[in-house]
Amino acid sequence: MWIDCRTIARSIEERTKERVEKLGFTPKLVSVACTDDPSALSYLKSQRKKAEKLGIAFEILNVSPEEIVSTLKKLGSDESVNGVFVARPFPPSFDEKEILSSVPVEKDVEGVNPANLGLLLYDEEIFPPCTAEAAVRILERETNLSGKRVTVVGRSVTVGKPLALMLLKKGRDATVTVCHSRTVNLEEITKNSDIVVVAVGRAHFLKKNMVKEGAIVIDVGINYVDGKLQGDVDPSVEEIARVTPVPGGVGQVTTALLFEHVVRAAERQRK
């Protein structure tokens, strides 16, 4: 069975729009871009459309490699800007850690600055990474996480690692296993899990025989195969488990949360 993520995203957007109206001013998101990646540019276009729908001001700043860090620091002191997003992927020569560390902490609506990531160790979710939070929101709608055996396949800084911390948080209380490319007997681990989250960047990686019947599967994958968007989960898994679709799944909720974070940042800055 496919999980209806669009309804979750719409609910988040409706609440965000209500909060925008109560602010008394128009919050603003600035997306900084130094990439020619087609999928990144497409996402920026979708951000513009979503911002207009929600009543949020939006601007794209196209900068050179030499300007990106200084631009991010300037945005930190610009009182007209409430949220800052950095388009990725970066060119191979870029120092990703330096760039992400330059995103203003109080405007880091995507949750990429190491300072915001570090707060997750203390169960503080001010601006958690949007994709990881999207997975959590979907799971909380589908089930009670307490005591559930969750396997996260993938250990990236933006999804796997922060998601594991968020699932362990007191009040959620999941039992979490993190797997990766060196994990032995992966199928045995996933097959004994109530929930499997896959974020490995390999189309149709998780097969039907790797999942137990009735499990919940969160597909975070974004892969283009013959020009078509495919997830990390094989479509056959849907026959025995509840699965988030690709497209129209986690990505929908991720974008909705990005703009929820913009409003949260605006509310915090107003105080």
From Swiss-Prot:
Pathways per UniProt: One-carbon metabolism; tetrahydrofolate interconversion
Gene Ontology CC: cytosol
Catalytic activity: (6R)-5,10-methylene-5,6,7,8-tetrahydrofolate + NADP(+) = (6R)-5,10-methenyltetrahydrofolate + NADPH; (6R)-5,10-methenyltetrahydrofolate + H2O = (6R)-10-formyltetrahydrofolate + H(+)
Keywords: Amino-acid biosynthesis, Histidine biosynthesis, Hydrolase, Methionine biosynthesis, Multifunctional enzyme, NADP, One-carbon metabolism, Oxidoreductase, Purine biosynthesis
GO molecular function, one term: methenyltetrahydrofolate cyclohydrolase activity
Chain sites annotated for binding NADP(+): G154, R155, S156, S181, I222
Any single biological process term in GO: purine nucleotide biosynthetic process
One Pfam family it belongs to: THF_DHG_CYH_C
The enzyme's E.C. designation: 1.5.1.5, 3.5.4.9
SUPFAM superfamilies the UniProt entry points to: Aminoacid dehydrogenase-like, N-terminal domain, NAD(P)-binding Rossmann-fold domains
UniProt function note: Catalyzes the oxidation of 5,10-methylenetetrahydrofolate to 5,10-methenyltetrahydrofolate and then the hydrolysis of 5,10-methenyltetrahydrofolate to 10-formyltetrahydrofolate.
PANTHER family: C-1-TETRAHYDROFOLATE SYNTHASE, CYTOPLASMIC (PTHR48099:SF5), C-1-TETRAHYDROFOLATE SYNTHASE, CYTOPLASMIC-RELATED (PTHR48099)
Protein name as annotated: Bifunctional protein FolD
